[in-house]
């Protein structure tokens, strides 16, 4: 481990001890807000303190085993103990480095998934449908709930646009690397000459706004329109203007909801999406300079960045943000087996974060 990382760990361990002292102070215990704040911080630092304590014990075991190695009768046993201790220290070192990576407060959030057909006409819409199905299948494997907010079907299948809310623990943490342009190379069903076509679809992953991180929106900045829904709800939705379209005038952001029976319910859904969009837009602008130096623009919603190519003739999927990240398992991945891909992206992100921490003063 680099000395800079070790110093950060030692500082956090000292802070953990300080918090334990503070929480034992009757004055702090009587102050509900401070007690809650310190308790939350202590809980966040506890894994680091526990792992450091285990590292200290393991180093002591290693030193004792090295002392025994000088005894001919104990040498064989000592060598075994040394090997076990060294292996455990390596594991603990890796754990401590991972614990240093700041937790993304949005990781446990639900999210909005937006998939839109890009270049490629009908084939792009079909591919957008393939991507949405891929994420839906993955969500099913994770036991997450998928709620379609709005959709515009393609003329020959798939979707020109589909927006859904995904509800489940850790949903954003797993899918936050999916934002960007996805490209497909394959022979369309309508291609009589057997030529390979290239089409594209864009994906945006937007964390749902937490009530704690809620933002204030001036009602005067909103233009609210109603229209007849074509979504769920049976014949009722076509008889009343229950669907809602909200335009945020300062930014031009437009959101719709038409899946609920009542205008009130659709308005609530649309406002949730609007808040999520505005919060994410502000966060992305603040992170632009930093993101420019990284290969993984996590959750930026940057649709202009080509992140992945799906080559059907070769059964190959390539993620362009990570060197040598090519998997020849496209049939399973497109059916929702995304974990091998997501795990590699998460590892790359952790490596980037550790490099950044190592170089920080």
From Swiss-Prot:
Principal subcellular localisation of the protein: cytoplasm
What Pfam families is this protein classified in? PCRF, RF-1
What subcellular locations does the record give?
Cytoplasm
A GO molecular function annotation here is: translation release factor activity, codon specific
Mod. after translation: Methylated by PrmC. Methylation increases the termination efficiency of RF1.
Tell me the disulfide pairings in this chain: none
N5-methylglutamine PTM sites in chain numbering = 235
The record's annotation in InterPro entries points to:
PCRF (IPR005139), Pep_chain_release_fac_I (IPR000352), Pep_chain_release_fac_I_sf (IPR045853), Prokaryotic/Mito_RF (IPR050057), RF-1 (IPR004373)
The cross-references to SUPFAM superfamilies, in alphabetical order and at most eight, read:
Release factor (SSF75620)
- PROSITE patterns assigned: RF_PROK_I
Q: Where is this region: Disordered?
A: 284-306
Q: Does the keyword Nucleus apply?
A: no
Could you list this entry's UniProt keywords, alphabetically sorted: Cytoplasm, Methylation, Protein biosynthesis
Q: Which GO terms describe its cellular component?
A: cytoplasm
Look up the domain of life of the source.
Answer: Bacteria
Q: What family is reported?
A: Belongs to the prokaryotic/mitochondrial release factor family.
Q: Which NCBIfam families match?
A: prfA, PRK00591.1
Name the job this protein performs. Peptide chain release factor 1 directs the termination of translation in response to the peptide chain termination codons UAG and UAA.
**What is the name attached to this protein's record?**
Peptide chain release factor 1
The species this protein belongs to is Xylella fastidiosa (strain M12)
Q: Which gene encodes it?
A: prfA
